[in-house]
Every structure is written in structure tokens, then in C-alpha cells.
């Protein structure tokens, strides 16, 4: 991968653990933390896909809040305004994966420009990064807000070329979400899929360039391939 001049990362589920919200959910709804977290994330993604198809964009915070309301209604849990705000705020305080910081340090030390490209709004991306004290790691924070549509629309991925300043074939796209990795590959990025769960890749006719188990493996492979 000697032609790689920059790398862009998905945020939710790739650099940051979306299931870290389960702890807050458990504090509020004892015995339901994991089920809330899983269904909430599922509906959050579904709402972004459906809104893109319907042409009814809202920012990621609104999609996340709506998904939470559905989740609590579906599970028969009451949701007052204070609890709704507390749980929604948990998405602004996500926990980075244990290997996130070290992996990004390796890329920065190698002189590689690094960005985030996310469904999150500009505000939410900045808050997640700031709250985890990771501002040092990123040269660009790229939001779908600029095109008013969510991944996997190709207009989102085209933002990386504009903001990173390199053609797509020179930008490594990194995601743990198979659907996202497939769409990025279809767009024309070289893609590294972080397969943490040892799962099967989606059958969408567009495959990743490289598959690893975690971010540590990704950084080792990428830095060594740049030499």
C-alpha cells in the first residue's frame, strides 16, 4: 500500500464502542442495558438508511433520539424528558476502543494524515472526540451534514477526497461496519475492514482490500506497508 497518502476512519463502532452506552442504559433501566443498546443501535442505522432513501435528512442526533424513543416503546419502558436527554448524551461520551489511541499514534508518527468520516453532525463528532481527549489524532473531521445524506451514499465518501486533498485511490478507508466497508470499496477506496467479531462480510459485490481483527493489526500492517 505504498500509494496510500492518508487514512479516514468511521467513528461509530470503529474507533469508538457504541455499546459503551449500555452502562448508562443499565443504570437507568436495570436488567435492560444490553437489549436497549443493541436495539437502539440497530434502529439508529435503519433510520439513517431509510431517511436517505426517503430524502428526509435530519441530523444524526435527531435520528439517534428517534431510535431511542422507538426502542423504549418497543421494550415497554417509560421514557421521560430527563432520561431521554441523559441517554442521548451518552452518545457524546462514547468510549474509544482500547487500541484506538495507540493505533492512531502509530499513523501520526509515520506522517500519515488522518481523518474521521462519519454520519455524525459536525457538533457531535467534535464532542465525541473532545470528550475522549483525542483531538490530537485527527487532521480532518468530516460530517455527512455537508451533503445532507447518510452513508452509504457515494456523496458522503466523496467528501474525503475534497477534505483530505488526495484522490480516492490514495486514501485508505477503515471501518468495522461491513456495509460501510463495502460501500467505500464500491466508491473506489482501498478498504481495511476491522472484523472484531470474526463475522462474515456482506455479499454486496464489493470487498475490502484488507481484513484485520482490530486497530492494532491495522496500524501494524499499514505502517509496515508504507516503508
Swiss-Prot record:
SUPFAM superfamilies: HAD-like (SSF56784). Pfam families: Hydrolase (PF00702). InterPro entries: 2-HAD, HAD-like_sf, HAD-SF_hydro_IA, HAD_sf, PGP-like_dom2, S-2-haloacid_dehalogenase. One of its GO terms (molecular function) is (S)-2-haloacid dehalogenase activity. PANTHER family: HALOACID DEHALOGENASE, TYPE II (AFU_ORTHOLOGUE AFUA_2G07750)-RELATED (PTHR43316:SF3), HYDROLASE, HALOACID DELAHOGENASE-RELATED (PTHR43316). The active site is at 10 (nucleophile). It catalyses: an (S)-2-haloacid + H2O = a (2R)-2-hydroxycarboxylate + a halide anion + H(+); (S)-2-chloropropanoate + H2O = (R)-lactate + chloride + H(+). Its EC number is 3.8.1.2. (S)-2-haloacid dehalogenases may be used for the biodegradation of halogenated substances and their derivatives which are widely used as pesticides, herbicides and other industrial products. The record marks 14, 151, 157 as: Important for catalytic activity. Belongs to the HAD-like hydrolase superfamily. S-2-haloalkanoic acid dehalogenase family. This is (S)-2-haloacid dehalogenase. The keyword Hydrolase applies. It is an enzyme of class 3 (hydrolase). An (S)-2-haloacid binds at residues 11-12, 41, 118-119. It comes from the Bacteria. Catalyzes the hydrolytic dehalogenation of small (S)-2-haloalkanoic acids to yield the corresponding (R)-2-hydroxyalkanoic acids. Active with 2-halogenated carboxylic acids and converts only the S-isomer (or L-isomer) of 2-chloropropionic acid with inversion of configuration to produce R-lactate (or D-isomer). Keywords: Hydrolase.
